[in-house]
């Protein structure tokens, strides 16, 4: 039995940790592995999918680099009869059912909750007042839009906090974040009281400029990358929210394994979101402030994810392997209804294609409640706590 995983690169710890989860899960379920890097190039990723299906891969897992690419990649899976999971990025007004059964499921971090929690942590660390810099990521992408919404939501609760001018894009990379922070420091200087980085790379890029200018302020990021966790340990960052790379990959493998062995997800399970932990140096200081996400020790998280094998029981994620009453996602997951899609993925009613209608499960409150309860009941163990 063979598989293929599609990742952007091996240059950052998020993708390295994602690859680690994929390799571990495939070993647990007995699949040969094949990791392909696409460097964020849609055409390269499409060629890799085409090659995998022509070589009779049993399943494909990964993330699409652009929203629109999700459609053509999903169609490739369905036309070949090859099951797959495409996570995190999906086209507007498009769900797995629009492609076909082989698009096993879509899931994504709850970008809004993650950024809201990180922003609350930052604003509390700032003492509830002052001016902060917010450097965003790639404009127009769901992670960036959702995280902006989360920060704005937190701002509503802190009337004495203000943003240092408008957000500027750091494109999720250090060098661009440095350029933006240089501009912000020249404009605001010592009036900067905090910094929100749209991911750890942005946070770390901005920190270097702040440090060069002797500006010592609270900083938060998102991803819980190795460099980000190191910055938390060194008190250069207050905290970082995990991207859960290994879990994302392993969950994808488990769902494809279930599909290949006759278990299909309900309609409401086809679009899911998850909540990841906030990684800090002293969790007890933050458990009362952070109410939407779990709070974990950054050093313990670093050991669990990046040192040796990850703590997940991959077979436990499989309904086929563990049984209907014993499987466990090992993370907090919820189905996405239409409102969630609009909030987290930034779907707008005016962009809906003429004549398009979502499958009923996404607006059926009973189906949503049943699925929410199912995943709450099955979430029995959190290996990171």
Specify the residue positions occupied by each region the protein language model found.
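A residue-level marker of the well-folded mature domains of exported/periplasmic proteins
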Residues: 1-385
């Amino acid at each position: 039995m063979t598989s293929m995983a599609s990742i952007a690169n091996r240059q950052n710890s998020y993708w390295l940790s994602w690859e680690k989860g994929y390799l571990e899960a495939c070993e647990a379920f007995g699949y040969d592995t094949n990791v392909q890097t696409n460097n964020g190039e849609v055409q390269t990723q499409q060629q890799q999918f085409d090659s995998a299906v022509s070589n009779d891969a049993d399943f494909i897992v990964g993330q699409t680099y652009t929203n629109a690419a999700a459609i053509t990649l999903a169609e490739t899976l369905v036309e070949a009869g090859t099951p797959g999971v495409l996570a995190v990025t999906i086209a507007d007004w498009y769900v797995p059912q629009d492609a076909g059964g082989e698009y096993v499921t879509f899931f994504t971090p709850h970008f809004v909750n993650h950024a809201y929690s990180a922003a609350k942590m930052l604003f509390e660390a700032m003492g509830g007042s002052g001016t902060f810099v917010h450097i965003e990521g790639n404009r127009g992408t769901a992670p960036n839009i959702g995280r902006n919404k989360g920060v704005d939501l937190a701002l509503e609760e802190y009337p004495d906090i203000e943003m240092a001018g408008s957000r500027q894009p750091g494109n999720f990379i250090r060098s661009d974040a440095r350029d933006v922070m240089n501009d912000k420091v020249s404009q605001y200087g010592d009036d900067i009281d905090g910094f929100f980085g749209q991911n750890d790379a942005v946070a770390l890029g901005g920190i270097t400029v702040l440090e060069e200018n002797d500006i010592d302020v609270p900083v938060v990021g998102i991803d819980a990358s190795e460099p980000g966790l190191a910055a938390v340990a060194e008190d250069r960052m207050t905290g970082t929210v995990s991207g859960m790379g290994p879990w994302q990959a392993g969950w994808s493998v488990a769902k494809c394994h279930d599909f290949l062995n006759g278990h299909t997800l309900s309609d409401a399970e086809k679009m899911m979101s998850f909540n990841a932990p906030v990684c800090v140096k002293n969790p007890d200081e933050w458990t009362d402030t952070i109410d939407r996400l779990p709070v974990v020790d950054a050093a313990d998280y670093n050991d669990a994810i990046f040192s040796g094998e990850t703590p997940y029981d991959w077979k436990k994620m499989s309904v086929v392997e563990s049984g209907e009453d014993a499987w466990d996602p090992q993370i907090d997951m919820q189905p996405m209804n239409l409102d969630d899609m609009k909030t987290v993925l930034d779907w707008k009613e005016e962009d809906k294609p003429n004549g398009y209608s979502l499958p009923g499960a996404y607006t059926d409150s009973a189906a949503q409640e049943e699925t929410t309860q199912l995943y709450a009941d099955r979430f029995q163990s959190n290996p990171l706590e």
